[in-house]
């Protein structure tokens, strides 16, 4: 199935029994939001993953519900605006020149949505680079996880010097619920930032519900 909308192509692909929805130039289309189904198998721990068709797509993810988010949860109308700033980001330095992937919607981009996976790809014609990001829920393990794989390909015949900075700008420690983040932001930050922990060998928290791993 193929459909033309706003000069961008959408199609449904069947390959070896796997159904995938492919959208070209997804950043130029009307906004939409959805969730990965969180399939983790009978022995796994499901993770919910909330994504939109902007930037690197993933806005928030966590376990159980939005009170157990690892990346802060935003409603759709806010997520469309924030995903490029608070979601996953990838910075490259090629031969001394800096660039950020998936930051320009005018670039050639493609989104591929599977049953339990999401992939995006961008071709940077001027820099002769292509970047692909794959997301999927880790199945069959005792720990729940959203797996993210970033692949950068040099499309030029020449060797290049390439440096990569990639990741998410902030994460929420265990025990910090959505209401605390939204309505007690500065207080929550103070609870998240124990100081002189290594010197004192101890940290004081307001209640047993605020548990976090300190490494």
What are these regions (language model features)?
Residues 1-215:
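Anionic coordination/interaction segments
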